[in-house]
Amino acid sequence: CLYSADGGVPGDFHFQHYAARAMGGAGLVFTEMTCVAEDARITPGCAGLWTDAQEAAWARLVDFTHRHTQAKLCLQLGHAGRKGATKLMWDGIDQPLEAGAWPILSASAVPYFPHSQVPRAMTRADMDRIRDDFVAATRRAERCGFDMLELHCAHGYLLASFLSPLTNIRDDEYGGRIENRLRYPLEVFAAMRAAWPAAKPMSVRISATDWKDGGLTDGDCLAIARAFAAAGVDLVDVSTGQTVQDAEPVYGRMFQVPWSDMIRNEAGVATMCVGNITTADQVNTILGAGRADLVALARPHLANPSFTLHAAAQYGVRDIACPPQYLWGKDALLRNASREQADLRELRLKARPRSHAPSADALVSPNVG
């Protein structure tokens, strides 16, 4: 998330951010989690889609992207739940607001930190209202012209709070076994799917594990993926964790890929993997091994909006889309890429330490006739 909206309206920073990545060669650009109501925000700076002004701003971005690039745009919709009413990321991530907070909701009255605001456990009336908020935002997304829609059910936010047994301690039909914990998230998804054009894809983002004893199991993860697939999801965006503040994740390169692999190959559902994937070689290794259908890279694109174009140049791929205004730069990049790779190979050879192993002649025994 950019945490840079004013009144939920995406502004100039959002426009240049998403447009730059689209012009830089990315095939599919996901938005940040876009909130479906004012009280659905994580922070006061979160972007939303519940007003006409917000809709107009998003529509401008979509129109520009479609006119000037070949990229597709996916809008990610979500509700912060118990992780709402918090400070901007750079002021203290997940820390509660000291002033100006709004009431928050969750599956159960379980705060994120001991000092966080205690959320109110949702009633059936709350569920109806928030489901309708998601549907209203879905209809706005279609009017904006987005190509794809994603429902955020991960990272401990509202819908994720129903899925995890660490945050869902309800004793009604929405708590207990995984089938009950899935009930409300599936209800929201089904309502959105009915409002979203059948020809346009929908994905769902999930946390495949909570990285905490007593949390989601692999069996739960597969059940969640299968249930959403049966409800009409086209893709599962596989993330992990961020459910509870005392989780114990094990980080590393491509560390979330095993769950994408499991869902794709055991549940038979198309997946997108994310998380500490930083190079084009890693992407192609994942795809070539059949461990995901799509790979999302966020931080590499934060550092380099034209990451995809640079990756294509490294592979010698010339037919990657580029706005005509930037063709001279693309040509220079492709022309220089092979030279730079040759220079790097030469440098590595020169930097290789000299061998101290005996030569082949020295290993031949002398003729002592």
Where are the regions a protein language model picked out?
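Flavin-dependent oxidoreductase catalytic cores
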Residues: 1-369
